[in-house]
Amino acid sequence: MLFFLFFFYLLLSSSSDLVFADRRVLHEPFFPIDSPPPSPPSPPPLPKLPFSSTTPPSSSDPNASPFFPLYPSSPPPPSPASFASFPANISSLIVPHATKSPPNSKKLLIVAISAVSSAALVALLIALLYWRRSKRNQDLNFSDDSKTYTTDSSRRVYPPPPATAPPTRRNAEARSKQRTTTSSTNNNSSEFLYLGTMVNQRGIDEQSLSNNGSSSRKLESPDLQPLPPLMKRSFRLNPDVGSIGEEDEEDEFYSPRGSQSGREPLNRVGLPGQNPRSVNNDTISCSSSSSGSPGRSTFISISPSMSPKRSEPKPPVISTPEPAELTDYRFVRSPSLSLASLSSGLKNSDEVGLNQIFRSPTVTSLTTSPENNKKENSPLSSTSTSPERRPNDTPEAYLRSPSHSSASTSPYRCFQKSPEVLPAFMSNLRQGLQSQLLSSPSNSHGGQGFLKQLDALRSRSPSSSSSSVCSSPEKASHKSPVTSPKLSSRNSQSLSSSPDRDFSHSLDVSPRISNISPQILQSRVPPPPPPPPPLPLWGRRSQVTTKADTISRPPSLTPPSHPFVIPSENLPVTSSPMETPETVCASEAAEETPKPKLKALHWDKVRASSDREMVWDHLRSSSFKLDEEMIETLFVAKSLNNKPNQSQTTPRCVLPSPNQENRVLDPKKAQNIAILLRALNVTIEEVCEALLEGNADTLGTELLESLLKMAPTKEEERKLKAYNDDSPVKLGHAEKFLKAMLDIPFAFKRVDAMLYVANFESEVEYLKKSFETLEAACEELRNSRMFLKLLEAVLKTGNRMNVGTNRGDAHAFKLDTLLKLVDVKGADGKTTLLHFVVQEIIRAEGTRLSGNNTQTDDIKCRKLGLQVVSSLCSELSNVKKAAAMDSEVLSSYVSKLSQGIAKINEAIQVQSTITEESNSQRFSESMKTFLKRAEEEIIRVQAQESVALSLVKEITEYFHGNSAKEEAHPFRIFLVVRDFLGVVDRVCKEVGMINERTMVSSAHKFPVPVNPMMPQPLPGLVGRRQSSSSSSSSSTSSSDEDEHNSISLVS
């Protein structure tokens, strides 16, 4: 695009110069100088007119250019090369027939130069694009591992070589003809058989008559259809395999490929430098992944080529085709063999087909040209790949050569290593071919000729046989079974693993010849299915057990290690004559038998990280081998499907086994019921008798509760009632027990009523005790003198501390304030306000009980006062019990008792309406007797409940006044008092320890402290402390009298 813009710009610039530079519109010629005149006659030369004022600036002579230029008719227009021969001083040159003014010639010269440069640029750009496209096509052939290696660029069709001409003579004739027809070969491109083109019949006939005479092989179809690509080979692993010499590189060019794009080249199609034998003995290679029509369905496997550069196909030399007898040979690069396809390909081509199979010296990339293959009987003649290298290489050197690295595991290497087994192999191959050839009447003639050639071939030496077999390029049918231990089908794509890997891992594995459909055997007339194989043949084939002869049949009892059967979806599959029914059954059984399921190992998988090195990267798969048999024995999973699998293999019993139990109930529920029955140690008869009589004392509360837990669902109850004794299903112990209970009408309703009767006494007793406790707690709080003394002390202390505030001069406080006394601490950080109040009450109570003021009496008074204060917790014991109760729970218990009475009345009515049996009468009578007594008890409990709740309400109002209505919890007052009593008890213990310490210090002259590590107090301080304590005691006694008087006034 940029080039055309540049060229257009140059044209515009040149035209603008012509038009606008000199402004000589009328004085310039109408037509260009280098173009012929519009009319044949040319006017005579005219001189320059005097009125013409426009002259070129470079011309000094006015008569140099006339007004109308002259165009001579006789001479042709000058070529562009003549413009380059003008001298530099063109202005002084006098040309009699000047056709152009000097300025115009310069400008047109610029245009011509730009055109030439642009054309060169276009050619360079086209060459660059062609080079990039060819490079991309080559990269596509080698880079993509997921596609097949040999794409449509490797689709080559070659005729079979003539079997009459000797190799040397054919080589000489080909050389001479190729030297003389080098130029004609390039021009007559129709002689090369490209995909999708027509064959030049005249040129082909002449060439075939001059080189080969009359060809014994009938011709192919003229309209060739696209062939499938060859199987992908792992050539990237060995880059040296594709290297060739200078002669090969010089003789290489590319042709359009047969794919849809039509861009990739066909590798090395017939150059003059190649020998005629290679031209004749060409190779047809294609891939099974692109097999198109049934008409082209003859599959013959060949050795895989190592590199596209190594394949040296030649232009086909064929005679006039006969479409009526067309057989399209397609050589599949698949490691499988179809003997039927080989037999169908031998129709009317006995001698030629045999020579193509066993004598053709060209294999796509593994063999060399015949002119260099001097020793055809040598085992190395089929494996040498370079004409310059092969005659000098020994077998050891060939195996070590890097250029043969990909071919080191080639399937035919086994024949080179052990050529002595070729006769046995040929015998087996002949027998297999005979079974196929005799099965089709249309191929009888070709089959007989082919078998004769096989007999002649067996008489050769092992080395020559190995050489001829290994060097077969077109129908190397013996190579496929070596590399393919698996069955192949028409629908199967190219195998994922290359033949190299398959051969290296499965040399000892018995091959499986592929099953092919009748439409694959022949495109025109499908042959009938082959007859069953004869037994003596298998006996003879099973005797060959050498490693190299991998075509021989293994023992019939040993199936292949990895059977692989892919039957065709749309076509019937015929059994191969080399496949026994026993092996097929064994392979199918091996496929159907899955590995046993093991116990799961629950772990958290870690994702592999590519940006850091992990320990898992150093693990090798081959470093540890798992003992499959041991792990399957130890950790096999116990699945529930084992019993059904066993029942499928064994005949199903008509009658159920006697151990079939627990068919109605859930297994877990049945097991729980059985455990309860064994723990309770009762029989079914005892339970049924108690239910019929309504005797709750016989069963007890625990058994009745267990029976309620055993209650079945409606579905289970329906199944149990529908069960008959004649049923083949045997009931378990739990199911029998439930069925016996369900035979009693409304059995579980009876159980519920009897459980209520059994629990009634205990429920009533608990409620009575609870209500009595509440009444006693209320009485204790109202009559406790010490609790009132504590409230008085707290009130005086709080008023003293709240002097001058709004909270001062209080007459009462809520009991919740008692819990806040421990939060107010003194200056030392240890003594709290509750400590102070308790010490003052202890001193006052001791003084009141003793009545003496001496030092010894003071200590006794403290002891007496501490005992009185400590007894407060014991005085309010019912308050602690009442604090553990919940008013809502007590109310629910009372309501349940009243509802239970209603349920019993309903059960009695149901029993009386349904049946009149004696058992039901006994149950009703017992229930009625209980109802009379229960109703009286419930009335008493309800009355006691109302009394207790009213007392709780009164005591709350007694302490809190009108604020009792704000209480959300009726029993909260008991909770507060219980918590305060716990704090007072702890403080009394601490004060008792202080008093003991004071008693020990006052008993000695120099009192020893409780802690011996502390320094002893001075004697003067002791006297001061005694005097201060005596004075404080006298003052407190007087203050106690004043406080008592004030409290009496408030009350």
Swiss-Prot record:
It is a single-pass membrane protein. The chain crosses the membrane at residues 108-128. Residues 1-21 form the signal peptide. It is found in: Membrane. Keywords: Membrane, Signal, Transmembrane, Transmembrane helix. Residues 35-71, 140-192, 206-324, 363-412, 457-542, 1009-1051 are annotated as: Disordered. GO terms for cellular component: membrane; plasma membrane. Induction: Up-regulated during gall formation induced by root-knot nematodes. Residues 588-1010 form the FH2 domain. Residues 207-216, 512-522 have a biased composition (Polar residues). The keyword DNA damage does not apply. The keyword Secreted does not apply. Residues 49-71, 180-190, 278-301, 401-410, 459-473, 484-498, 1027-1038 have a biased composition (Low complexity). Residues 35-48, 525-536, 1009-1018 have a biased composition (Pro residues). One of its GO terms (molecular function) is actin binding. Its main location: membrane. Interacts with FIP2. Belongs to the formin-like family. Class-I subfamily. Might be involved in the organization and polarity of the actin cytoskeleton. Involved in polar pollen cell growth process by maintaining tip-focused cell membrane expansion for the polar extension of pollen tubes. PANTHER family: FORMIN-LIKE PROTEIN 1, FORMIN-RELATED. This is Formin-like protein 1. It comes from Arabidopsis thaliana. The gene is FH1.
